[in-house]
Amino acid sequence: MFLRRLGGWLPRPWGRKKSTKTDLPAPEPRWVDSSPENSGSDWDSAPETMGDVGPLKTKDSGTRRPPQAAPESSRDTRVYQLGSKRMDSLKKDKAASAIQESARLETGGAVPKLDLDPVDSGGMKNLGVSPQGRLGTTGPEALLEKPGRRQKLLRWLRGEPGAPSHYLQDPEEYLQISTNLTLHLLELLASALLALCSRPLRAILDALGLRGPVGLWLHGLLCFLAALHGLHAVLSLLTAHPLHFACLFGLLQALVLAVSLREPVEDEETADWESEGQGKEAKEQTEGPGRAL
């Protein structure tokens, strides 16, 4: 074995063929013809591979291949990877700035803050991740979660719990708004008809000489009949054009609901102001004797 290694280290140009392709990075192992006819020795007849021979030699000179080629290639790959990671981080920073700008324009100047962690081992930044390892509350998803004016209006119209409305606090009271409105409209119509026909009927009865209890009874009966015929005429007119009067009633009901739903909020605000004023007065009264002492 030692002689075989020694024979491999010694230069023997007549024993094996020299490799002509020395620029290849990793030559494939091949069998060398080391027969007794070529080498002239019996111990050299065993087959051996190029891996046992040692470093390759160039054709022109006996110098070895410089070992700096592999480190240079690995260094180039590392530089390329670092450059690609920096480009990715720059792209993510630009995306984050674009998101902040769009959010600032939508919210009217309020810029949401994105959680930016320090640079990790790969040289990249994590956007929207808190140090505890959980997703931050800020970001495009959080921006989408914030309700806009249209969503608030829809919630207010639907009477949802998240809407700024007091509809769900006392539903029975607010359900009586529409019924009371219809009742008041019919009452106004009947009172207008009665006021319209009361004086003429009273004048007619006085002219006929019907006074006293009999005149009062007749006056009441005639007013009832006149109001009944008047209501029949008005209701027939309303049923002849239901769409137009329904639109008018809807507009009137919307105004009444807007006013009645806004009043409790104002009442609560005034109550809060009054309670705050009373609290300040009580503090001043308690602090007054203390200062005097």
UniProtKB/Swiss-Prot annotation:
Name the UniProt key words of this record, in alphabetical order: Phosphoprotein
Q: Residues bearing Phosphoserine?
A: 34-35, 89
Is the keyword Ubl conjugation assigned to this protein?
A: no
This protein's record includes keyword Flavoprotein: no
Superkingdom, taxonomy of origin: Eukaryota
UniProt-annotated stretches for the region Disordered:
1-95, 268-293
Query: Pfam families, per this entry?
Result: DUF4661
Q: Where is the composition biased (Basic and acidic residues)?
A: 85-95, 277-286
Q: What InterPro entries does its record include?
A: DUF4661
PANTHER family named among the record's database cross-references: C6ORF47 FAMILY MEMBER, SI:CH73-25F10.6
- Name under which the protein is recorded: Uncharacterized protein C6orf47 homolog
Question: Source species, please?
Answer: Rattus norvegicus
